[in-house]
Amino acid sequence: MTVHKEVTITATSPESWEEAALSAVERTESSVEHIQWAVVQDQSIQLGSPEEPQFRTKVKIGFEVEE
């Protein structure tokens, strides 16, 4: 039997939503093995300063739990 776990990660990027989503997955890969899928749940822009907006994504990441 295979068991999966889901975590929700929020990441930001000054470049794009795509970069933010990839960053969320890459950072999760550094501490979690067997990632199976990722789904972008939400996107927004953080407007701390007009010159440097931050693209923010909320990503649900699923991975297989080892037995």
Task: Identify what each model region corresponds to.
Residues 39, 44-67:
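A cross-kingdom feature marking charged/low-complexity
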Residues 2-37:
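Short, well-ordered alpha-helical segments
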